[in-house]
UniProtKB/Swiss-Prot annotation:
Keywords: Repeat, WD repeat
Name listed for the protein in its UniProt record: DDB1- and CUL4-associated factor 4-like protein 2
InterPro entries in UniProt: CUL4-DDB1_E3_ligase_receptor, WD40/YVTN_repeat-like_dom_sf, WD40_repeat_dom_sf, WD40_rpt
Gene, per the UniProt record: DCAF4L2
Start and stop residues of the WD repeats: 268-307, 312-351
Keyword rRNA-binding: no
Cross-referenced Gene3D superfamilies: YVTN repeat-like/Quinoprotein amine dehydrogenase
């Protein structure tokens, strides 16, 4: 694949995108007008056509803070719910990492500009897992799970997002900052469920730990394997967990941790599960493992209904991104290619090469949204690799 990368990049720059036969806007519109194509199918195929024609543009990073160095390499990015803020983890040459928030409202303008706020430098500490947390309001905090080091124990830390953005007239004051001492965590998830209000979960070695932030109360659920991926369902009282053994199981939050009645749905992969995404209705789940297998599960029938082919993963913790509004699944492989599939049908819509040669140290981190930059934003993909940000907007 690396030998094909320069040619693919050149074709993308020249906007020479090839789509499936019949997948062009005039043809689809004509079929819809003649009644040969139902409106729902027309909308779905139109979205897929736009995804296959995404165009790459470099994003200009304009810093308000001298400490936000543009030379720091992106390690991970994580967009909030509205996709108007981007939490970033940047690798520092001297050791350790910088954590910060980028305002993305500038993505709605033709210039494609973003603005980093002040950063927090943490020397010699590694974050194994992170997610946005809605403590005071939607995405008010960041939940970071730090690995222990020497005499410094591992912990889960809730950082208010306002800590990074700073103080401006009319802005909220920094919210609650708190830390919980826990064993080294492989994964974490914040609950939006009424059955675990103001709570988060951490996936540990052969254990799931559920913590209430307000009361400090903790519940432990024993497992037979390390828990590498987690997500709370919103519509149902379940916490889903993906394990190193390949098992996926749900914890019924109504049952407590006594006995074995808390273990609900059980599914299985052939390798370690690295990512879980529950669809909004709570009836379907997308999961991936360390063999590159990505599956869509029907949770009511407890069976796989769709498989997404082409993802490359041999040993890494790589996330899978699901956007139901656009009807797509996106994932970056160890080969540094970003692939986007149709959520419903599973066929590959587009393959995006990295702007840089493939390397284990240069695997892109991406975010996909229907509204990049906020409410008035356009659909597309945001990619962070090395020191650069790229936006792949719909054509």
């Amino acid at each position: 694949m690396e030998s094909k990368r320069p040619r693919l990049l050149e074709e993308a720059d020249k906007q020479k995108k090839t789509v499936r036969v019949g997948l062009n806007a005039p043809s689809m519109l004509r079929k819809n007008q003649l009644g040969f194509l139902r409106f729902a199918n027309y909308c779905r195929i139109a979205r897929e056509l736009r995804v296959s024609c995404m165009q790459r543009k470099k994003v200009q990073i304009h810093s308000w803070d001298p400490s936000s160095l543009a030379s720091d390499r992106f390690n991970r990015i994580l967009a909030n719910t509205n996709t108007d803020q981007l939490f970033t983890v940047n690798q520092v040459e001297a050791g350790g990492s910088k954590y910060g928030i980028i305002t993305m409202r500038g993505l709605t303008t033709p210039e494609l500009r973003v603005y980093p706020h002040k950063t927090l430098y943490v020397p010699n500490r590694k974050v194994n897992s992170m997610c946005w947390a809605s403590l005071n309001h939607l995405d008010s905090h960041l939940l970071l799970c730090f690995v222990g080091l020497a005499d410094t124990p591992s912990c889960a830390v809730l950082l208010p997002a306002s800590l990074f953005i700073g103080s401006f007239p009319g802005m909220r004051r920094p919210g609650m900052l708190c830390s919980f001492q826990i064993p080294d965590a492989w994964s974490c998830a914040w609950s939006l469920s009424i059955h675990a209000y103001h709570s988060f979960s951490t996936g540990l070695s052969q254990q799931v730990l559920l913590t209430n932030v307000v009361t400090g109360h903790q519940q432990s659920f024993g497992t037979s394997s390390d828990v590498l991926a987690q997500q709370f369902a919103i519509m149902t009282p379940l916490l889903f967990n993906g394990c190193r053994s390949g098992e996926i199981f749900g914890i019924d939050l109504r049952c407590g941790n006594q006995g074995s009645g808390w273990k609900a749905i059980c599914l299985s992969h052939d390798s370690a599960v690295t990512s879980l995404q529950i669809l909004q209705d709570g009836q379907f789940l997308v999961s991936s493992d360390m063999t590159g297998t990505i599956k869509l599960w029907d949770l009511r029938a407890t069976k796989c209904v769709t498989q997404y082919e082409g993802h490359v993963n041999n040993s890494a913790y790589l996330p899978v991104h699901v956007n139901e509004e656009e009807g797509v699944v996106a994932a970056v492989g160890q080969d540094c290619y970003t692939r986007i599939w149709s959520l419903r049908h599973g066929h590959l819509l587009t393959t995006i090469p990295s702007p840089y040669p493939a390397s284990e140290n240069d695997i892109p981190s991406v975010a996909f949204s229907s509204r990049l930059g906020g409410f008035r934003g356009a659909p597309g993909l945001l990619m962070a690799v090395r020191e650069d940000l790229y936006c792949f907007s719909y054509g």
